Regions:
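N-terminal polybasic/positive-inside topogenic patches
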Residues: 2-5, 9-21
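Short His-Asn-centered micro-motif
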Residues: 65-68, 106-108, 120-123
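Short coil/turn segments at beta-strand junctions that form active-site/ligand-binding loops
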Residues: 60-61, 116-117, 134
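Long, hydrophobic N-terminal alpha-helical segment
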Residues: 17-67
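Glycine-rich, aromatic-bearing surface loops/beta-hairpins
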Residues: 134-170
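SF2 helicase motor core recognition
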Residues: 112-116, 121-130
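Helix-adjacent hinge/juxtasegments
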Residues: 75-113
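Short Lys/Arg-rich amphipathic alpha-helical segments
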Residues: 38-41, 45, 71, 88-92, ...
Length: 170
């Protein structure tokens, strides 16, 4: 007879093998097929705003890690310009309510340490703090030189133990 007590000591072991455990880290790379600029935002920046809105509506707390302060300000302004019915509560890192808004926009010199569910990374290099997240969203831009940097980040996520996926936006 098998002792079923191990299920209580190690609850994740009795999950369906295909079911993700709460500890599994996932990185999804969105493939972009163009770099159309609209309203002062690149295609990837437009997509970041849409993904952040979608994840916030799903009840997640999001950190958007920008390449620099100028990019953070562009995203901040774009999120403020959304119609009232699609408003996304957000703030630049270090601003807003205590604990931050559900969506925080940061850059390398300015990042809060409040808990977030998802990292949306616009960084061209692998963000060393990405390993603190169980879900990361990254991008494979249209431009060839930026694709090579995305390949390097993909390898870094794999080495960090992330389950890797690719996707396209609807």
């Amino acid at each position: 007879m098998i002792n079923a007590g191990w299920r209580y000591a190690y609850p994740a072991l009795h999950l369906n093998p295909r079911q993700e455990t709460p500890y599994m880290k996932n990185a999804t790379f969105y493939l972009l097929d163009n770099d159309t600029h609209q309203d002062g935002l690149s295609a990837v920046e437009q997509l970041v705003c849409e993904i952040a809105a979608e994840r916030w509506r799903a009840g997640k707390r999001v950190l958007i890690a920008c390449e620099d302060e100028q990019q953070a300000i562009r995203l901040d302004e774009a999120l403020w310009a959304r119609p009232p019915e699609s408003f996304v509560p957000h703030n630049l890192s270090g601003e807003g309510p205590r604990g931050g808004a559900p969506v925080e926009i940061a850059w390398p010199q300015k990042r809060n340490s409040s808990a977030r569910d998802i990292l949306i990374s616009l960084r061209t290099d692998f963000a060393d703090f990405a390993t603190a997240f169980t879900e990361v969203i990254d991008f494979v831009p249209y431009e060839d030189s930026l694709k090579q940097l995305a390949r390097e980040r993909y390898k870094a996520y794999r080495l960090a133990g992330f389950n890797l996926n690719t996707a396209t936006w609807k």
